[in-house]
Amino acid sequence: MLIHPPRITTEPYYIMKNRIYLFTVAVASFMCISCTKTQTTLSENEKTVNPPIMGWSSWNAFRVDISEDIIKHQADLMVKKGLKDAGYHYVNVDDGYFGKRDDNGIMHTHEQRFPNGMKPIADYVHGLRMKAGLYTDAGNSTCGSMWDNDAAGVGAGIYGHEPQDAQLYFGDWGFDFIKIDYCGGDALGLNEKERYTSIR
């Protein structure tokens, strides 16, 4: 329903009614301008908010039954299905890539699951313009060694090998981040806060 303003006359009643109408229009206009300004401000703020870290990790779908082909395929699917464009930029190779430590304490990859080593995985993920991550444990052994009876995870944790493993994972293999679990740390009875602080 369209409401027309009253005719302006010199009679006091109409003058008062007209003033009320003008006051109402002025208040409504101010409210509309305020609402628009607030919406613009919110939109500007929303543009500056960084999304949380989002990505994919191999553990929930595959546990320790992973391979080079599986990781590459999942990274490809993240791009193909639009997850990368939606902000999912992290690909985490979870427990299951470990082979064994040699006599010098250097970690090697599982020869059957990752015959080409781990650097090609990081390079492949980087080629898709995403971040590559690895798993380890704060203790001696990994969760897979306890929950999945994966013998390769025994002694594969970062405990006692922090600088050595950091150089290998970040420097030599080229990974961007590391997920540090706590199954092995808990089994050793380590203080969680102190342990994670020392790793940092």
Language model features by range: what are they?
Residues V25, E46, K81-L83:
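Generic marker of residues within folded, mature protein domains
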Residues S67, L190-E192:
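Short, solvent-exposed loop/turn segments at secondary-structure boundaries
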Residues I20, N45-V49, Y159, D172:
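Alpha-helical interaction segments
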Residues E68-I71, M118, Y196:
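Generic preference for well-ordered alpha-helical elements
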Residues M1-T41:
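Bacterial Sec-dependent N-terminal signal peptides
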Residues Q74, M78-G189:
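Aromatic-lined carbohydrate-binding/catalytic grooves of carbohydrate-active enzymes
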Residues Q39-K72, L77:
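N-terminal module-boundary/linker segments of secreted carbohydrate-active enzymes
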